[in-house]
Amino acid sequence: MSFTVTKTAPALITPSEPTPSGHILPLSFFDRLPFLRVFLVDMIMVYGRGDQPAKVIKEAVAKALVHYYPLAGRLTTDTDDGELSVACTGEGVWFVEATADCRMEDVNYLQVEPLMIPKEQMLPSHPEGVDPYTLPLMIQVTQFRCGGFAFATRANHAVFDGIGAGQIKVAIGEMARGLKHPTVKPVWCRDVIRKPIPSQISATEPHDTDLSPVSDIKFTNNQTNIECCSFDLSLDHINHLKDRFAKEVGKICSVFDVITAKLWQSRTRAIGLQPQTEVSLTFLLNIRQVVLHNELPPDGGYYGNCLVPLVNKAPSGQIANAPLFEIVRLIKEAKDDLLRKDSASLIGGMPPYKKPSYADLSIVDWRRLGLYEADFGWGGPMFLVPLNEHTVTSCSTYLFKSPVASKKDVCLVTYCIVKEHLEAFRAEMNDFT
């Protein structure tokens, strides 16, 4: 059965009050990294109910843009230094209203991969002749027959990261609920994160993340042979392992550390690479308090890119055969080591983007980005639906909150296994579900 989404023509939402305009705001060194400036992040947030959500959200966006006025501007390189910057033009954010001719349950709450409604119908569009890479943010609100709605965004990663996205969407929700000002005041200060001077970077800092070629499995980078699967992980079991780790190792680890260790080991065992083949695990760390500690107020507010990738590498045989707590320790120590570095080393140590192989795995923790707190007046989202990150990193996994409020499980969604390894991967992960 096919379903149809009917869209209105895109319309510009401008700030509801006058905002600073006619000047250029610089972006940070992180913001200007090549793989971020051309990365349009597509995402859907699924809500169970809402009364005229498009109208409410449209008005809230206009109010939020007073505080987040750079989002109403345009990305440009027409500057004195030729660097990517934001021109504060006040033009506004493109907004699309849409209706779907079905209920959310008819399309499984947009949780099936591929989507039962083509993602192009769910995502905001822009008028012909407009360059999407100049737009910080576009929004579409789609109302379903059941009363639920989807809040979809397309955002240029050069302007904000995942934590920034959460902060912005929470602010829109606060405006929708009648607040006059966002609880967290937005902070720009992009010029603090400057391009590092080579002499400031530690000589031991890694700058090349190339892995040895993986020749013992065929892997294409077009996602056609990658299977999507999900697991509901028991928090009771994970907390039990955390307690055991604390007793045996004498240190405290997080839920993320335990899940990530189990995931890395399970996948490494399932894909069966040669023991000497190097495998990698990459995840993001928030370094706001390290590089911006003198600039940020106590409640934060910086919404630019400040999540850095931490790449963990080890021989396949070591990860497959080590006790789980040893892998937890490796992950925890890598995190602690990175956060002990000084600001210059953190900024200068950003690894260049490399095309990944099947030996590489990445994980993103969507529970901690603030997105679940984006409440437009009818509660937070039931589901988050990232639509394109796994096409960039290839072997990706995501941690979500359980959509059932009474459950304390963590939902793990993976795009990291080819079909021939799926059964073995599920078997390895089963004792965590």
Curated annotation (Swiss-Prot):
Keyword flag Transferase: yes
Active site, per annotation: 157 (proton acceptor), 375 (proton acceptor)
Annotated EC: 2.3.1.-
Keyword Transferase annotated: yes
Top-level division of the source organism's lineage: Eukaryota
Any Pfam family the entry gives: Transferase
Reaction equation(s) it catalyzes: myricetin 3-O-[beta-D-glucosyl-(1->2)-alpha-L-rhamnoside] + (E)-caffeoyl-CoA = myricetin 3-O-[(6-O-(E)-caffeoyl-beta-D-glucosyl)-(1->2)-alpha-L-rhamnoside] + CoA
Enzyme type, top EC level: transferase
Gene Ontology terms, MF aspect: acyltransferase activity
InterPro entries for this protein: CAT-like_dom_sf, Plant_acyltransferase
Annotated pathway: Flavonoid metabolism
Keyword annotations: Acyltransferase, Transferase
Tissue expression notes: Expressed in young cromes.
Similarity comment: Belongs to the plant acyltransferase family.
Function: Caffeoyltransferase involved in montbretin A (MbA) biosynthesis. Catalyzes the caffeoylation of myricetin 3-O-beta-D-glucosyl 1,2-alpha-L-rhamnoside (MRG) to produce myricetin 3-O-(6'-O-caffeoyl)-beta-D-glucosyl 1,2-alpha-L-rhamnoside (mini-MbA), a precursor of MbA. Mini-MbA and MbA are potent inhibitors of human pancreatic alpha-amylase and are being developed as drug candidates to treat type-2 diabetes. In vitro, is able to catalyze the caffeoylation of quercetin 3-O-sophoroside (QGG), although QGG may not be a physiological substrate in vivo.
UniProt protein name: Myricetin 3-O-glucosyl 1,2-rhamnoside 6'-O-caffeoyltransferase AT1
Organism of provenance: Crocosmia x crocosmiiflora
Lineage: Eukaryota, Viridiplantae, Streptophyta, Embryophyta, Tracheophyta
Gene (name only): AT1
